Each structure stands twice: as structure tokens, then as C-alpha cells.
Amino acid sequence: LIELAMKGKRVLRLKGGDPFIFGRGGEEIEGLMKKNITFQVVPGISAANGVSSYSGIPLTHRDHAQSCLFLTGHFKEGIISFDWPKLIAEKQTVVIYMGLLSLQEMKKNLIKYGMSKNMPVAVVQSGTTQSQKVVIGQLRNISSKVNKARLKSPALIIIGTVVELRKDLNWFG
């Protein structure tokens, strides 16, 4: 972005989803601002919002979840460093972006820190597209179900009792 803009080019950075939710939008803008390069941000629909809607899984629901956490399962150093006890709150949905490769480790830690092994989980591959695949399970068995279904990235993980609503709210197929 900076290199081309400094050459006088008009540059468009097209990002699927919302550039400010695990999209490096903030980091890129910091660089542009340091060089006094003008820019504009057009926010998109975050993957969590789009994928959950196309999967028939509301992220919040008065009977199930009054809060929702967005987390990344992809780390600079490759080390998962969540504050695990904070992820275990009742009536909360946890959404994990880019977490397919670390699903087994995250599952073990969630159970270790007190989340029920029967907590509903959805893993959605290629959400909002005609290739969308949704695998539903519980913490205790989601890894084996995902492996059996041969899910690949991009995938979003949704954890919480809201996942149970999919059986009645699924409209996309």
C-alpha cells in the first residue's frame, strides 16, 4: 500500500469481511498515517456476523447468550495465549477465527478450565458461499467430527448454546 501510494498510484486494498476484525486494517492504517498518506475505510460485514447468519446460528439470543467474544486462533508466535477462565462465562458465545488447526488444543483447554464437554460447537467452512459446510458437535467430539468431514480453512468456530438453535433457524441449507 505504502510503496505504491508513494509512487502516486491510487491503491485499493480489498479485504473480505471487516478490516478491523482480525483483518490487519488497524496495522495498515498506522503505516499509512505515519507516511501522511490519505486513505478511506469502507467497513464490511465481519465473518462472524455473515457466517453465523448463513448458518442459522444467532451470536446472541435472550435465552442463550448476552455476550459474544471474537478470538483469533492464529498467533504471531504460534502459541495460544488466551485468558481461558474468561472464556468460560455462562450465556456467552465464543467465536474463533482461523482456529481450525488449533481446535484440538483449544477444546482441551476449554474443558480443562471448566467449560462443559457437552457445550455445543459449530465449525463452518467457507461460510456464506455455495460451498458452505457446517459441522455440529460438542466440545468432547467436535475434533473427530471435523476430521471425519475433512473440513479445511477458511473456517469459523462458534461455541455456545446458541448453536442448538440452528436446527430450527437454518435457512441456507
Locate predicted features:
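Short glycine-cluster motifs
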Residues: 3-74
